[in-house]
């Protein structure tokens, strides 16, 4: 079982496809809850989260503080961090289940996973953001916050969770390093 935490800021439109991609996981019994942690939106982000049955929190605190606070409230042993607008590719549920089972059979506390970035060919009309994200991933050769992060609560707590800054998503990926991803 896993809990999803989605970071938002004026994300009423981009939140919808992210939540839609999670529906099959909820129907399959894999996804227990979704927490939307917001940075003070002035649009209908809260209403979208409410209609979808998500728990919604809003704060002017830095992103890392919001993510850490949201993580403290979830019930599942696995946490999936996503940004609003992230749409996991088809097959992500099977990949996540396989990864979680494999990690639990080996050293479950020592591994985390990221998802593949969608290639521009998988996007109906790729925009500049999708193309730049793919190019950045190819050049950097490292995981990006746009990919999402699947991590056990034990490992999350062991590394101290998200740092307090606004660059918290990239910082936690750097702290995890390639050996744990």
Q: What are the functions of these language-model segments?
A:
Residues 38-46:
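A conserved acidic beta->alpha catalytic loop
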Residues 59-74:
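Glycine-rich, basic loop-to-helix element that forms the pyrophosphate-binding segment
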Residues 111-123, 133-151, 157-158:
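A recurrent flexible, glycine/aromatic-enriched loop bordering the glycosyltransferase active site
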């Amino acid at each position: 079982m896993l809990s999803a935490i989605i970071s938002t800021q004026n994300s009423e439109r981009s939140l919808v496809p992210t939540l839609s991609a999670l529906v099959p996981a909820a129907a399959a019994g894999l996804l227990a809850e979704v927490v939307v942690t917001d940075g003070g939106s002035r649009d209908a982000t809260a209403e979208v989260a409410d209609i979808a049955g998500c728990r919604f929190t809003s704060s002017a605190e830095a992103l890392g503080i919001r993510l850490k606070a949201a993580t403290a409230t979830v019930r599942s042993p696995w946490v999936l961090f996503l940004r609003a607008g992230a749409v996991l590719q088809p097959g992500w549920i099977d990949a996540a289940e396989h990864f979680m089972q494999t990690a639990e059979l080996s050293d479950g506390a020592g591994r985390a996973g990221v998802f593949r970035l969608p290639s521009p060919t998988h996007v109906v009309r790729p925009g500049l953001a999708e193309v730049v994200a793919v190019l950045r991933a190819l050049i950097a050769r490292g995981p990006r916050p746009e990919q999402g992060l699947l991590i056990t609560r034990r490992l999350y707590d062991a590394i101290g969770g998200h740092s307090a800054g606004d660059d918290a998503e990239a910082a936690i990926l750097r702290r995890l390093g390639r050996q744990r991803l």
